[in-house]
Regions:
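Conserved class I S-adenosyl-L-methionine
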Residues: 1-47, 50-58
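A short, conserved alpha-helix within the catalytic core of class I
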Residues: 127-135
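A conserved beta-strand element that flanks and buttresses the S-adenosyl-L-methionine
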Residues: 119
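Conserved beta-strand signature within the Rossmann-like core of class I S-adenosyl-L-methionine
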Residues: 144-151
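A C-terminal cap/extension of S-adenosyl-L-methionine-dependent methyltransferases
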Residues: 195-246
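Class I SAM-dependent methyltransferase SAM/SAH-binding core
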Residues: 59-107
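Short alpha-helix
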Residues: 173-191
Length: 246
């Protein structure tokens, strides 16, 4: 049974996926393209012959790419039935290695110890973190890994933008704060957190394609140097979280 919050999230994402145009802020995502590169590098290295869950798969873009890495099976779930319908059109759902389901990430239908990897992008901050981390822990196999890209809620200018554009986000979303990382550390082991999007976001108008831009390469390297200092971590836009079930 869905909670009131779950219902609001489902309605928000169904409405979002029913629109013909994407959100304006999508233009900013090139500033954290290096997080996506690291995300898929991890999956490229670890997906072969693994059972994988795309947790909040949306319309299936990540899942389609991970299929190239030869998983044993990959399952995508999302609370939005509109998203799953779109995903089935994008991905060959007749492939026996793929399953796409409408499901509640906070209370999935899977058995204990089902997956080698659970991954997602921009999903945890839409959920009750305690509940979903316990659920991920339950469905991961011992030694299984979680992998998530999530926004941070610690940069005051980004938070101001969020307040000025409430219709672009769901009512219940909560970009991650320091206490959320403590929650993760209490539930998983071998945790690695990498930060992205400070200088690359500030100067995003001066470069075009990040993968071809020497300016972007300089900025992302400067970011990684600055993120060694705690105060700059709070100015990052997003993080890549890798952790393991004990």
């Amino acid at each position: 049974m869905l909670s009131e919050k779950n219902i609001r999230e489902k309605e928000f994402h169904n409405k979002l996926q029913s629109k013909s145009k994407g959100r304006f802020e999508n233009i900013f995502y090139k500033a954290i393209s290096n997080s996506s590169n690291d995300f898929f590098d991890f999956l490229r290295t670890n997906s072969n012959n693994s059972e994988i869950l795309d947790y909040g798969c949306g319309i299936g873009h990540s899942l389609k790419k991970v299929l190239e890495f030869n998983p044993k099976k990959i399952t995508g779930i999302d609370i939005s039935d509109v998203s799953i319908q779109k995903a089935k059109k994008i991905i060959n759902n007749s492939d026996s290695t793929v399953e796409l389901l409408v499901d509640n990430c906070e209370k999935t239908k899977f058995n204990n110890n089902s997956f080698d990897i659970v991954y997602g992008t921009g999903i945890l901050h839409h959920l009750n973190l305690e509940i979903c981390l316990d659920e991920i822990n339950r469905i991961l196999k011992p030694g299984g890994k979680l992998l998530f890209i999530e926004p941070l809620g610690t940069n005051p200018l980004i938070n101001l933008y969020r307040k000025l554009s409430p219709n672009s986000r769901s009512k219940d979303e909560h970009p991650l704060l320091g206490r959320d990382f403590e929650t993760i550390k209490n539930k998983f082991v071998k945790i690695d957190i990498k930060y992205y999007g400070f200088l690359t976001l500030i100067f995003f108008p001066i470069y075009s394609s990040p993968n071809k831009s020497s300016i972007f390469r300089i900025l992302k390297n400067l970011d990684q140097f600055l993120f060694k200092i705690n105060i700059f971590k709070k100015l990052a836009w997003s993080v890549l979280i890798v952790a393991e079930k004990n």
